[in-house]
């Protein structure tokens, strides 16, 4: 095909059907020689200017914000994997994180008041409609590992959950040492939502291995008891404790009442 005829065909396609996603016709062409590639570079603009013709590398950049793309995300509970379906048909499944340049290439190319520089040649481009056996350059979505808050037994998902100090929940941490110890960190017992400061001070309490799991299982299974009962239960299971150097309760229950509890059998 002569270069003049190719230029005329591309310009006609460029002028027709300029709206997404209502456009239905998709044209795919490849510049197999140097002259054809030069014509493509002259006619095809960056995605900010033209949305009809684009290069494969431009597909990795974010799309326009004015239109919607139909998609569906499915979660696999067995291995905590997420599958992305585009248009209800195309399935994207990934098993490794993308390389760092691919994640930030569009951010580095954008400048205030200008347009993005678009790469016109791509060495190896694999369509997502026919996934190959290679595992490079794919993305994995997994649940973020929660962490326990210091003052209460609340999960912190960095924005996914609100952290509020709770008087009915506390944190138990067991250390795998010769002398198995459990650290109890209590939060405020008041019902006021404005009170978030810790109202307890506790030191290390020596516990046996079975007692640690007994306290955790009992508190997790039954949430109907008051905070005072849970606190007494924690001390009740603390058998074989030779020393309780310091256990201060402020404004709720007297220290003498808790230390007078019998030792578990």
From Swiss-Prot:
The protein's matches in InterPro entries, at most eight in alphabetical order, are given as:
Tubby-like_C (IPR025659), Tubby_C (IPR000007)
Pfam families reported in the protein's UniProt record = Tub
Q: What are the recorded GO MF terms, alphabetically? A: DNA-binding transcription factor activity
**SUPFAM superfamilies on file:** Tubby C-terminal domain-like (SSF54518)
Cite the F-box domain residue spans from the record. Answer: 1-44
In the record, the note on similarity to other proteins reads: Belongs to the TUB family.
Question: What is this protein's name?
Answer: Putative Tubby-like protein 4
Organism for this UniProt entry? Arabidopsis thaliana (Mouse-ear cress)
């Amino acid at each position: 095909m002569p270069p003049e005829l190719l230029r005329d065909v591309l310009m006609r396609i460029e002028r027709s059907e300029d709206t997404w996603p209502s456009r239905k016709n998709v044209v795919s062409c490849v510049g197999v020689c140097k002259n054809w590639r030069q014509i493509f570079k002259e006619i095809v603009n960056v995605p900010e200017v033209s949305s009809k013709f684009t290069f494969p590398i431009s597909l990795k950049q974010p799309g326009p914000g004015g239109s919607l793309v139909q998609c569906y995300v499915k979660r696999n509970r067995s291995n905590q994997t997420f599958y992305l379906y585009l248009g209800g048909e195309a399935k994207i499944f990934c098993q490794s994180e993308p390389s760092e340049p691919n994640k930030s290439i569009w951010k580095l190319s954008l400048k205030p008041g200008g347009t993005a520089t678009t790469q016109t040649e791509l060495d190896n481009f694999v369509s997502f409609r026919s996934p190959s056996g290679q595992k490079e350059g794919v993305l994995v979505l997994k649940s973020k590992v929660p962490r326990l808050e210091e003052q209460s037994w609340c999960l912190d998902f960095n924005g996914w959950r609100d952290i509020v100090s709770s008087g009915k929940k506390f944190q138990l941490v067991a250390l795998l040492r010769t002398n198995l110890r459990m650290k109890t960190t209590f939060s405020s017992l008041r019902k006021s939502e404005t009170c978030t400061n810790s109202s307890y001070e506790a030191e290390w309490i020596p516990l046996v291995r079975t007692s640690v799991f007994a306290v955790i299982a009992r508190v997790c299974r039954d949430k109907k008891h008051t905070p005072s009962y849970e606190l007494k239960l924690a001390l009740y299971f603390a058998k074989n404790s030779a020393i309780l150097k310091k256990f201060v309760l402020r404004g709720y229950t007297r220290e003498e009442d808790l230390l007078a509890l019998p030792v578990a059998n």
